[in-house]
Regions:
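Active-site neighborhood of HAD-like aspartate-dependent phosphohydrolases
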Residues: 1-50, 56
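Asp-based, Mg2+/Mn2+-dependent phosphohydrolase catalytic module
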Residues: 1-8, 97, 103-196
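A short acidic, glycine-rich active-site loop
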Residues: 39-43, 64-65, 122
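Short, basic/glycine-rich phosphate-binding loops at helix/coil junctions
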Residues: 51-62, 112-117
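Short, acidic loop-to-helix structural element flanking the phosphoryl-transfer center
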Residues: 64-91, 97-101, 130
């Protein structure tokens, strides 16, 4: 199946559909998380009271970023072209669902997705776990092999690989993970151009 034949596309949000603005090092410092630890995994391992307080801080920090979000180069045009082709579109993000909705509205992409096709960290295990992609495949009644996962980081590609989907790397200057990326495009505009 070529990229032009794919009808089921799942996108990461931050850094893929939007310009990446999260300062993960600053978030780790504010939450007293070791720099080598994954933020979400670290919070999940904390005692309930401490985790709740830190999750609340993270949610408020992300809310500020959501309202100020800006679209990634060519992302809106890519999504609208895919919708015109009759493609089913989903979002799989490590962000909170409610903030994903805010972000997508802020960047003019809210009309491209059904709310139930937007999975955040509370609806699916955080990437690189494949659970979110597998959930969308089941919901859409398709095999994961017929899906593309588009993202800007190795977690997106690892998620695709683990689910049996194909991974597309975008919005980075070069392909840092050629062993994981089935396709690479420097940005969403270039990916749009590959559709023909």
């Amino acid at each position: 199946m070529t990229i032009t034949e794919v009808r089921h596309w799942v996108f990461d949000m931050d850094g893929t559909l939007t310009i990446a603005v999260h300062d993960f090092a600053a978030i780790r410092r504010a939450l007293e998380i070791p720099e080598e630890d994954d933020i979400l995994h670290h919070l999940a391992a904390l005692p309930a009271d401490e985790a709740a307080a830190k999750r609340a801080w993270l949610l408020e920090h992300e809310r500020e970023l959501a309202y100020a979000a800006r679209p990634a180069e060519g992302a809106r045009e890519l999504l609208h072209a895919l919708r015109e082709r009759g493609c089913r579109l989903g979002v799989l993000t490590r962000n909170a669902h409610e903030l994903a909705l805010v972000t997508l509205q802020a960047v003019g992409m809210g009309d491209c997705f059904l709310p139930e096709d937007i999975l955040g960290r509370d609806e699916a295990p955080p990437k690189p776990h494949p659970g979110g992609l597998l959930h969308l495949a089941e919901r859409w009644g398709v095999a994961p092999t017929s899906m593309l996962m588009v993202g800007d980081y190795r977690f997106d590609l690892e998620c695709a690989r683990a689910a049996g989907a194909r991974g597309v790397l975008v919005n980075v200057p070069h392909n840092e993970w050629p062993e994981l990326a089935d396709l690479y495009a420097p940005d969403c505009r270039a990916l749009h151009g590959m559709l023909g």
